[in-house]
């Protein structure tokens, strides 16, 4: 070591440990100043000084701490740093030598010190050899007094017998001496004096340990059997007292909650049972979990409605586009709720195709009411115990989804979404739909009993909202408990507005393009809606727009750096406003990054258009029908051909029983027009009807007039216009009956470029609810009989 060598390095002040040179060990730190010093050391050469204060209650942030530092510190090197948590680190330290602290200064949020290295004699002369030998013997006696049979092989004192300085440091580090004594040994620079002090202190410790052993042996010898029993009894009481800490906590929590008296009495009995059990008993763990669940549940802890009715209405109407009927029913209920807070909430069921925002609407409802929101997915649920919970006698039993949801919400009046209630399945484990009847009945759910709880729990303050794609197959008792709100798909204009107001801004924000000026023209969005998505909702549109923005990001990264895109102040927010013909308009005088996507360049950012065009066959016997599915409306082509031989009707295309009956019925009706269609009923030709997309099951009565028209068209050899579609059920006498799903069906026709639609006359009221945009672009013919259809198409 170079004599009088000096260095400037970060400093850490230790309060509880004394680190001796020649030792490698792990040290844990949780102090901000210490962590900052270690971080600075890692940025330099990993060297650091461990210093010690004469005042045990010193604080690194105290300016006067410098004056109280010991003159000698430990010069060390950081080998490894592990982050345990946000404010805790674990450091592997190699302590190397003693140094004298010349000065300490504060740098921002850590301390630095200037130090001078002091030579530490490691030579072995006869005198030091004798001292070292005596120290080793004293240390062996000290270990025997502690009943230590082995110690760390790496720090074995005998390994450093020829280096007295290392020997004394390692023995001092391995001993249980007080920190004040260890600090005195660290400060001592003379090796001989250091050994003398350590021998004296170890000898004192040996005497104290031997005296303690002697006293204990004499006391134990005097304890008779009765005294030993009393001693053991007191130990058991102390253990039980310590274990009873949980019991006291449970009692305090129980008294702090507004729990019904019968429930409180039951829990007190469970707590009493728990206190008499062994801590690790399986039954004790079951009871403990049960008690904690009861205490974690909200009991009469309601969220107060903070917003006024007008504010709630504003939030609902501005946070979600469309679904006016659902919003109206919620607002009507809240109007009554503000007058009478004990009114029972309705059970709403939003029915509609996927991707139209049913789930996000429920989230908006919870937000407007300032209530907690919890979602329960019921799709694929087939075990009744998932609803009612498992009885506690079963291993691994758990409460049902509703009790778990209440625990997660932490409030007694959350908004709970029951998603995809139509996809619940029955199994040998029971019918979950039957279990839902109690939950969704306002007359019963105030005392809902979960099998795990075994006590009534009040769900009457919960606002339940369910969603479904279809009501087909759902039990009538369950439907009877809910207010059904049918939510239809969106028109082009509605999708355009949703894209401009919600989708594009959210995608831009998620892509960190807030500081980039992006304009996507309306023509581009319209083209994406028409040619890339044929859906009732907007999920497909969001995917297309997301892919467009991603390609835009890739293009930007070729031209600009990441920091320019994310952090650059490219425009003033006031320069962006909503325009009529584009998403945003921009002041050209403001500098920045511009990306304008118009009808001429948008194809650079999207995939090749999918072939979504309808099948078009310009011949007689080909007609478009309109159908409703769980995913919205669709256009259903129907093909008919005839054979000269006499026969009946042949049906293909994966048809259900109702649709097959409709086809038989339609052919019978058409036969009544045999004279006008120029064929002999007695020689009725064989007709083959085919419905394309044969892998897709089709059923329902609404294709009646479509099938009849296709048969009449092939028999009369007259074509039906390819820009026309129809829907309606027919009777044996030729009357046209109303059908459901009019909005979805007409929207499907509009999406597919159909300009004329034939509808039952009794569906006028449904047609009137369609957006003006759709009604302005489609000509509708309302009919009450099949003859009107044939006359309109000039078939007869």
UniProtKB/Swiss-Prot annotation:
Segments forming domain Lon proteolytic? 617-796
Please state where this protein is localized: Cytoplasm
For this UniProt entry, what is the primary localization, expressed as one broad class? cytoplasm
> Tell me, what is one Gene Ontology molecular-function annotation carried by this entry?
ATP binding
Q: Which reaction does it catalyse?
A: Hydrolysis of proteins in presence of ATP
Which catalytic residues are annotated?
Answer: 702, 745
- Please state, per the UniProt record, what induces or represses the expression of this protein: By heat shock.
Query: Which part of the chain is the Lon N-terminal domain?
Result: 9-206
Q: What class of enzyme is it?
A: hydrolase
Q: Give me the segments passing through the membrane.
A: none
Sum up the protein's function in the record's words. ATP-dependent serine protease that mediates the selective degradation of mutant and abnormal proteins as well as certain short-lived regulatory proteins. Required for cellular homeostasis and for survival from DNA damage and developmental changes induced by stress. Degrades polypeptides processively to yield small peptide fragments that are 5 to 10 amino acids long. Binds to DNA in a double-stranded, site-specific manner.
User: What is the protein name stated in its UniProt record?
Assistant: Lon protease 2
Q: Gene behind this chain? A: lon2
